[in-house]
Amino acid sequence: MPKRTDIRKVLVIGSGPIVIGQAVEFDYSGTQAIKALRDEGVEVVLLNSNPATVMTDPEFAHRTYIEPITVEAAERILASERPDSLLPTMGGQTALNLAKALAEQGILEKYGVRLIGASLDAINKAEDRQLFKAAMQKIGVALPKSGYATTLDQAMSLVEDIGFPAIIRPSFTLGGTGGGIAYNREEFETICRSGLKASPTTTILVEESVLGWKEYELEVVRDTADNVIIVCSIENLDPMGVHTGDSITVAPAQTLTDREYQRMRQASLAIIREIGVETGGSNIQFGINPKDGRMVVIEMNPRVSRSSALASKATGYPIAKIAAKLALGYTLDELRNDITRDTPASFEPTLDYVVVKVPRFNFEKFPHADRTLTTSMRSVGEVMAIGRTFPEAYMKALRSMELGRVGLESPELPAEKEEREKVLREALRIPRPERPWFVAQAFREGMTVEDVHALSAIDPWFLRYIQMLVNEAQSLQEYGRLDQLPDEVLRQAKAHGFSDKYLGRLLGYPAEEVRAHRHARNIRPVYKRVDTCAAEFEAYTPYLYSTYEEEDEAPPTDRQKVLILGSGPIRIGQGIEFDYACVHAAFALREAGYETVMVNCNPETVSTDYDTSDRLYFEPLTIEDVLEVSQREKPVGAIVQFGGQTPLRISVPLEKAGLPILGTSPDAIDRAEDRERFAALIEKLGLKQPENGVARSHAEAFKVAERIGYPVMVRPSYVLGGRAMETVYDVASLERYMREAVSASPEHPVLIDRFLKEAIEVDLDLVADRTGAVMIGGVLEHIQEAGVHSGDAAATLPPHSLSPDLVERMKDQAIALARELGVVGLMNVQFAIQGKTIYILEVNPRASRTVPFISKATGVAMAKIAALCMVGKTLKELGVTQEPEFKHVAVKESVFPFARFAGVDVILGPEMKSTGEVMGLANDYASAFAKSQLAAGVKLPKSGKVFISVKDDDKPAVVDLARRLRSMGFSLVVTSGTHTYLATKGIEAQVVQKVTEGRPNIVDKIVDGEIVLVINTTFGKQEIADSFSIRRESLMHSVPYYTTVQAARMAVGALESLKCTELEVKPLQEYLGINAAPPGTRR
């Protein structure tokens, strides 16, 4: 069936900010979908609030709205753009929920817009657990025993029948938000309350426990002619009970019998037909009881998902692109497979390799959170590895994780035998992020495959391979010396995924010596293609992975090449922003005539799409893996400054091994990162930094802190995302920090800085070329005061309170620093301003996480310009010598995962905790801030009671805010100290007890829904601890809270702006003065 002619203009909804459960994979799928629609001549309008995405670049969609993903904003866009269709399947749960709301409120009908990709009926049937259950019963597909509840009482009566443990799954939520596993009545009540609150329809499913069953997923694609294909089967190594996003997964499924696979396949076809997904991809999850083979369906997603991104990367089959074209009316047999160019898209991919995905967690950022993995997703990123066998792919995946582990090393265990056994058995029984290493340790301690299976419920097939790897490591150790190791033994170890570093650890040699020995014996990897067809047809896209076999499938070309090192797994502190920079580098260098070679191991990203670069190596970002690629490809050089800390960490050894590093030299990077060299640099240029010192032992730390005076900021050297960074208020806190957070040593010193009270922090990004010319990209003023990590702080561009003179002085200082360091490419400087004094906090001669934001706001593609400077172009040649000028305001706001981690304090500090960001664009600061809050999911109130409690220093500043709130009709609720102060200024307010003063107190009022906004500032360890429950309950009850006066001031301005005017929506292209397709007309 050829393409429909009635689809000419489509609104695509993106997924908004990166959150746990909905991450970078939707930038990948959205970018693919937009390209596919444009290729077909369709006009594309995009709504997405996330500026760090490639899809929101102004050249992708015809009209790009970086606006809150809300019904109000979407309706205004529909009214002005008048698209004929809406594609909701590329933006995760956020897009589906918005499309559902627009349809049910009659807004789509009002503007004559149809849903494509998935009908409202299909969305409801798949997402509403009650309708899904009825649909499954109709076609005779079994589900776990379950029932629905819209109240706690209904849930309690259901569990009487279902029994414990019980699984709670809220409807229409993301990544299992609000759900969990309850083992008793108390846990059940707590999880049900949070599930009912999390579900937009206030419905939960209470389900019998299928804990310990095997879990599988099928990626299914269907077209309007009812052709259905299975793109990929995925098996979870972790059994049921762990969210699939938190499980180690393997593709294709390894332990299904052919009969079981056919049953599952037939069920999938019946399900996708009954639900009614006609055009596009769905992900269907199944559980199988290993004891009797009983199969049940768990759930389905009627959209592109995290798993479909993984399946696309695992198979080379671009699900999102195909789904977008199917939504236009094509059938599978009419579409070509890009990789082979010969086969139609209706051919199911065949794999002659194994893919392993391992999730990446960030529990170290939330030390008080429970690390147990359940049905509510907690991982922030993932890695994927490809090998010819499961052991090879598994070992490659584990070393891709960047956890400091290079293989199956022993985890820490108590020395005492009984205690050791108890800890080990618990680590096998309870799923936590470190379980893979405990499984290996169990075999070292003499446990059998049956013992480990009984405790962990991991399938014996996987356990036997892990046991084999442990035995192999032990027998390698017995050789004792490299020259005693037979070539065939070394070759087999490499074929099983043992890295040079792991072999070196086992034999007592540095990795370089193992590598030299291996090369001398001519043991090197070959590279195979991911080709969708197990090498049956020729593949045209070089999408490659390494393995230790004979035949090489993709010899390098003789073109000039640049190697780009990606950023590995997403984690807090190293997010999508760095992938964005790598993608831009690939685009720019390809346009400049270079062959681009990308190395990365993250399946969620645009950088690992098969057509982003000329050659893609899906490999771990380790010295060994990168050197093997570079020695084969022989690039003119490598770009390491775009992928965050991951490539920077390995840049010096790569340079030593003969790989030229493009742009800023590794030595200059070290001058900026090494505290003592940095202090000398600041002194040489006559600049200032906060008083500081370096401690190489506990005793030194106390001396330095005493000299500087408390409070101080403490942190380890060479970190990203403020890892283990803390504000310390007294000797006792420093003692605890030194004991628990870091181990200070000559190699790993601890940095101690004076804490700058009441200072304003500023980020500045620039590009420099080889001649010393500099272009300032933008200056961002933080809304929170100094002391909050720059990745967490809200910020405005241009600055909102700094004098032009101060801004010019900062620019001059940044240019002097760039020239002194010899920066070629990007550089970021963080300043703190106290009064009229400018302090330099840090200099990062690399891409920073603010680059995409500044590039979006100004229309200047900084990463592209920087990449071209790194291969020798000058800013003058590129025609960008002036700082970009613009008349609008952009506000960056961060998004946090606190709701997923019970008991974690939401107060911000020097350690980064946000997972993503949003942007507010408007012509004034108040409206831009209001948009940023709405985009971040903050519900700004129109009326009601505002709670104010501030530290003494902030009392004068809060008077004006209190007056403005009163004049808007809000009433004030305050603590006694603030009440006394406001009374002297003639401001009326009601007094409420502090948490420490008895009940009913402020927390009771928040829980009872009486408070609509919280302004609560604190300083000092005790005050912060005392007010913890105010912040936590505000978060859990969706009450906006502001913990600094600056943020409260912006919020009050935003409330005034919302009172006076409707927020307008405007495409990015209009803000930037870029010509886009004319709006409003259907052509």
UniProtKB/Swiss-Prot annotation:
<feature type="binding site">
    <location>
        <position position="830"/>
    </location>
    <ligand>
        <name>Mg(2+) 3</name>
    </ligand>
</feature>
<feature type="binding site">
    <location>
        <position position="169"/>
    </location>
    <ligand>
        <name>ATP 1</name>
    </ligand>
</feature>
<keyword id="KW-0055">Arginine biosynthesis</keyword>
<feature type="binding site">
    <location>
        <position position="301"/>
    </location>
    <ligand>
        <name>Mg(2+) 2</name>
    </ligand>
</feature>
<feature type="binding site">
    <location>
        <position position="241"/>
    </location>
    <ligand>
        <name>ATP 1</name>
    </ligand>
</feature>
<feature type="binding site">
    <location>
        <position position="790"/>
    </location>
    <ligand>
        <name>ATP 2</name>
    </ligand>
</feature>
<keyword id="KW-0547">Nucleotide-binding</keyword>
<keyword id="KW-0067">ATP-binding</keyword>
<comment type="subunit">
    <text>Composed of two chains; the small (or glutamine) chain promotes the hydrolysis of glutamine to ammonia, which is used by the large (or ammonia) chain to synthesize carbamoyl phosphate. Tetramer of heterodimers (alpha,beta)4.</text>
</comment>
<comment type="pathway">
    <text>Amino-acid biosynthesis; L-arginine biosynthesis; carbamoyl phosphate from bicarbonate: step 1/1.</text>
</comment>
<feature type="binding site">
    <location>
        <position position="215"/>
    </location>
    <ligand>
        <name>ATP 1</name>
    </ligand>
</feature>
<protein>
    <recommendedName>
        <fullName>Carbamoyl phosphate synthase large chain</fullName>
        <ecNumber>6.3.4.16</ecNumber>
        <ecNumber>6.3.5.5</ecNumber>
    </recommendedName>
</protein>
<dbReference type="GO" id="GO:0006526">
    <property type="term" value="P:L-arginine biosynthetic process"/>
</dbReference>
<feature type="binding site">
    <location>
        <position position="175"/>
    </location>
    <ligand>
        <name>ATP 1</name>
    </ligand>
</feature>
<feature type="binding site">
    <location>
        <position position="285"/>
    </location>
    <ligand>
        <name>ATP 1</name>
    </ligand>
</feature>
<feature type="binding site">
    <location>
        <position position="787"/>
    </location>
    <ligand>
        <name>ATP 2</name>
    </ligand>
</feature>
<feature type="binding site">
    <location>
        <position position="243"/>
    </location>
    <ligand>
        <name>ATP 1</name>
    </ligand>
</feature>
<feature type="binding site">
    <location>
        <position position="756"/>
    </location>
    <ligand>
        <name>ATP 2</name>
    </ligand>
</feature>
<feature type="binding site">
    <location>
        <position position="285"/>
    </location>
    <ligand>
        <name>Mn(2+) 1</name>
    </ligand>
</feature>
<feature type="binding site">
    <location>
        <position position="285"/>
    </location>
    <ligand>
        <name>Mg(2+) 1</name>
    </ligand>
</feature>
<keyword id="KW-0479">Metal-binding</keyword>
<feature type="binding site">
    <location>
        <position position="761"/>
    </location>
    <ligand>
        <name>ATP 2</name>
    </ligand>
</feature>
<feature type="binding site">
    <location>
        <position position="842"/>
    </location>
    <ligand>
        <name>Mn(2+) 3</name>
    </ligand>
</feature>
<dbReference type="InterPro" id="IPR036897">
    <property type="entry name" value="CarbamoylP_synth_lsu_oligo_sf"/>
</dbReference>
<keyword id="KW-0436">Ligase</keyword>
<keyword id="KW-0677">Repeat</keyword>
<comment type="pathway">
    <text>Pyrimidine metabolism; UMP biosynthesis via de novo pathway; (S)-dihydroorotate from bicarbonate: step 1/3.</text>
</comment>
<dbReference type="InterPro" id="IPR005480">
    <property type="entry name" value="CarbamoylP_synth_lsu_oligo"/>
</dbReference>
<feature type="binding site">
    <location>
        <position position="176"/>
    </location>
    <ligand>
        <name>ATP 1</name>
    </ligand>
</feature>
<comment type="function">
    <text>Large subunit of the glutamine-dependent carbamoyl phosphate synthetase (CPSase). CPSase catalyzes the formation of carbamoyl phosphate from the ammonia moiety of glutamine, carbonate, and phosphate donated by ATP, constituting the first step of 2 biosynthetic pathways, one leading to arginine and/or urea and the other to pyrimidine nucleotides.</text>
</comment>
<feature type="domain" description="ATP-grasp 1">
    <location>
        <begin position="133"/>
        <end position="328"/>
    </location>
</feature>
<feature type="binding site">
    <location>
        <position position="210"/>
    </location>
    <ligand>
        <name>ATP 1</name>
    </ligand>
</feature>
<feature type="region of interest" description="Allosteric domain">
    <location>
        <begin position="938"/>
        <end position="1083"/>
    </location>
</feature>
<dbReference type="InterPro" id="IPR036914">
    <property type="entry name" value="MGS-like_dom_sf"/>
</dbReference>
<dbReference type="GO" id="GO:0006541">
    <property type="term" value="P:glutamine metabolic process"/>
</dbReference>
<feature type="region of interest" description="Oligomerization domain">
    <location>
        <begin position="403"/>
        <end position="554"/>
    </location>
</feature>
<feature type="binding site">
    <location>
        <position position="844"/>
    </location>
    <ligand>
        <name>Mg(2+) 4</name>
    </ligand>
</feature>
<feature type="binding site">
    <location>
        <position position="842"/>
    </location>
    <ligand>
        <name>Mg(2+) 3</name>
    </ligand>
</feature>
<feature type="domain" description="MGS-like">
    <location>
        <begin position="938"/>
        <end position="1078"/>
    </location>
</feature>
<dbReference type="GO" id="GO:0004088">
    <property type="term" value="F:carbamoyl-phosphate synthase (glutamine-hydrolyzing) activity"/>
</dbReference>
<dbReference type="InterPro" id="IPR013815">
    <property type="entry name" value="ATP_grasp_subdomain_1"/>
</dbReference>
<keyword id="KW-0464">Manganese</keyword>
